[in-house]
Amino acid sequence: MISPAWSLFLIGTKIGLFFQVAPLSVMAKSCPSVCRCDAGFIYCNDRSLTSIPVGIPEDATTLYLQNNQINNVGIPSDLKNLLKVQRIYLYHNSLDEFPTNLPKYVKELHLQENNIRTITYDSLSKIPYLEELHLDDNSVSAVSIEEGAFRDSNYLRLLFLSRNHLSTIPGGLPRTIEELRLDDNRISTISSPSLHGLTSLKRLVLDGNLLNNHGLGDKVFFNLVNLTELSLVRNSLTAAPVNLPGTSLRKLYLQDNHINRVPPNAFSYLRQLYRLDMSNNNLSNLPQGIFDDLDNITQLILRNNPWYCGCKMKWVRDWLQSLPVKVNVRGLMCQAPEKVRGMAIKDLSAELFDCKDSGIVSTVQITTAIPNTAYPAQGQWPAPVTKQPDIKNPKLTKDQRTTGSPSRKTILITVKSVTPDTIHISWRLALPMTALRLSWLKLGHSPAFGSITETIVTGERSEYLVTALEPESPYRVCMVPMETSNLYLFDETPVCIETQTAPLRMYNPTTTLNREQEKEPYKNPNLPLAAIIGGAVALVSIALLALVCWYVHRNGSLFSRNCAYSKGRRRKDDYAEAGTKKDNSILEIRETSFQMLPISNEPISKEEFVIHTIFPPNGMNLYKNNLSESSSNRSYRDSGIPDLDHSHS
């Protein structure tokens, strides 16, 4: 009999187990079978669903429904009862209209990569707390957005409409928008009212549209007082836009347009701008003082423009040399005229800008590079930056040293081709230097494609080996002194020299001995010895091989003569059949081999021969011949009985 205390213990244990298992069973039943639920995160993505499954827990906060086949009919009406849901991922589905029946308090909605064509006020008014709306890669057009569709979206901060069918910026956007992405559409015009009132807008992306200067209003961006980033990449602008908001703009992207001029007031009052990119345009010069108001500029990128380093660009060199170290300027490489092509504007001396009215004394430093004697000058190449002095002794005299500025440093360069793809550069310095910038460029190639190569060498070095060059190609080598602050001296002139790499054939210095050897085929003294040794080894090997073959052939012939037997029709005299004939040997077969066993040469006595008459038992024939009743020697041989020992009964 069970005691009352023990009964109470068992009852309490069962009740405890029930309350522990009950929540698990309820939770298991509340999660749809095709989904996975994890603390408010419902994972129903990538399951080829055509509708949103029912039975989603009421405490769900994030719904992952992307990469399915859900259409508008597949969104159940009870979905709007999930009041705790804040994020819904419905991208890459089969929606063709803006979905309804969404939870009221959703804040982040991802609908990209569908086929949504219309946006109505009815659909947006049901989710008034929406903050982020992603509609990239759909079929939304300007006329398919209902007028006033966003008038109740007072919390909307991010609106992404990239890669749609928009031809203009949608009107009536809420003032709360901070980021607006309209890239890769068909927008060709932007009127001032389009962006009017978007005082909270911080980032505006208009890349990949059809915008030109005529399609932009005079002050279309001027009222965007909080705009920090403006991107107009991959459009059809021919001039930099003006009247930009100068209060907060920090990043301006204008690359990949057709800009060939910059108005003098384009960047006025942009004192907060720290990044400006105008790469891949058609700029050849810049108006003087265009960057004067850019007090906080740290990144200026101007790559792949056809810069003409004439007198109009001399101010750029002076401005570059006055910049602090923190300012990073890229892409100011001369494309013309030919004499300075491939050189950095920062490296050019005042004489190279050809400013005739500037009053600059055209004094040329006589300490130039020693020409490469192995490479003749060619008329079609541009003249070097500095001229070769018409003196035999390259060593400077006292008078020649005083022709330039006393602070000017002298460099003497010598270039020698070592191999078809290597040149040796050596130099001498008249005064000690901290560092030098060494650069080389293949002539006839645009430096915009990376043909120019630069390196920094310390002042203690006096030579440098350049490898991986193209054989039989012209190159220009330049050297410029540098200070420790990484700024060039104002009066420093780059010293350049032109050379050519050797052809692909073996490079030989032009000495008298080599000229004599060129008349004869090239001979290497080490090759005959190796050839003699190799030939001797080959001859010995061939002789040994021939000897072995002869020996095998000779022994094989004798062996064949002693052991050969006829492969044709056998005759009764070919074998010593059943030991009844006198022979010197008997063919003994052992499994798969045979052996010749000699027998005594003494004649076998006739008394040992016994002829047995074979009588078939019970009148049975010893063989069966289907073709003929007559006997034949072949039939008997097939039966295993010798021909001569067989007799009929």
From Swiss-Prot:
Spans annotated as Interaction with ADGRL3: 38-67
Disulfide bonds: 31-37, 35-44, 309-334
Positions on the Cytoplasmic side per record topology: 550-649
Biased composition, class Basic and acidic residues, residue ranges: 389-401
Main localization, broad class: membrane
LRR repeat start-end pairs: 59-80, 84-104, 105-126, 129-150, 155-176, 177-197, 200-220, 226-247, 248-269, 272-293
Compartments, as annotated in UniProt: Cell membrane; Presynaptic cell membrane; Synapse, Synaptosome; Postsynaptic density
One GO term of the biological process aspect: heart development
Function per UniProt: Functions in cell-cell adhesion, cell migration and axon guidance, exerting an attractive or repulsive role depending on its interaction partners. Plays a role in the spatial organization of brain neurons. Plays a role in vascular development in the retina. Plays a role in cell-cell adhesion via its interaction with ADGRL3 and probably also other latrophilins that are expressed at the surface of adjacent cells. Interaction with the intracellular domain of ROBO1 mediates axon attraction towards cells expressing NTN1.
UniProt subunit comment: Monomer and homodimer. Self-associates (via leucine-rich repeats), giving rise to homooligomers. Interacts with FGFR1. Interacts (via extracellular domain) with ADGRL1/LPHN1 and ADGRL3 (via olfactomedin-like domain). Interacts (via extracellular domain) with LPHN2 (via olfactomedin-like domain). Interacts (via extracellular domain) with UNC5B (via Ig domain). May also interact (via extracellular domain) with UNC5A and UNC5C. Interacts (via extracellular domain) with UNC5D (via extracellular domain).
Protein's name according to its UniProt entry: Leucine-rich repeat transmembrane protein FLRT3
Origin species: Rattus norvegicus
Taxonomic path: Eukaryota, Metazoa, Chordata, Craniata, Vertebrata
Gene that encodes it: Flrt3
